[in-house]
Amino acid sequence: SEENAFFQISPVSESYLNYFNDINHDFSYVRDYMKRINSYLISEYHIDGFRFDLTKGFTNKNIAENYVSSRVDYLKMIANDIRDVDEDNYIIFEHFQGFEEKIFSDYGILTWGEENYNYNEATMGYASDLSGISYKKRGFKNPTLIGFMESHDKERLMYKNLEYGNSSGSYDIKHFDNAMGRMEAAGAFFFTVPGPKMIWQFGELGYNISINQCPDGSISEDCRVSNKQSAFQLDMDKGIK
């Protein structure tokens, strides 16, 4: 209802940052609620880390892309509350706001480092800049950037290799073996860069089922959350060298 102090019927911050009703992050009871939930998960279930989704939306300000000092202070407070329970707990923010990410890095907080487009351009055989995977490129002093090539939000590299891969003479990236070779090469320019990395499920096997594949095999964004066969159901693990 409109009287609910915890949830706002109409999100205050920018609409693309909100899904369903928006939590009123400025309300003191909400902040205490967050503190108690995180503390309980650590003490009761021994959770060793948290990844907070879309932390850029942890504000009632309608200027999410700008620097918001109150948001930074609030997120630091969440980190402090977690560390009061377990000082070694992993804290990850999916934030995507460059200046604030530098502040969080200096504070020992890990941040999400998406490089799907650039790596996929490279694996498909097109010119690309992979330097964004480096924490130094983003101006961080500490290796707190969790780099990734694929995620639950992004298309599979191998799928696009096979669909849109470049070619030169007899060499065609749409050929499966060549496409897999490109994935191996991408790994060499991914894992060797200092800093933590995230491998999205089955990415290490060259999983090539589109994120948008429908149960009937067609491709549509309406099927983004449709069930997909696992790599084990498809025997992809049988080809590991």
Each model region followed by its residue ranges:
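Short, functionally important structural connectors and interaction interfaces within domains
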Residues: 15-17, 141, 175, 197
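Active-site-proximal helices and loops of the catalytic beta/alpha 8
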Residues: 43-48, 54-155, 162-164, 179-181, ...
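Metal-dependent phosphoester/phosphodiester hydrolase catalytic core
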Residues: 169-179
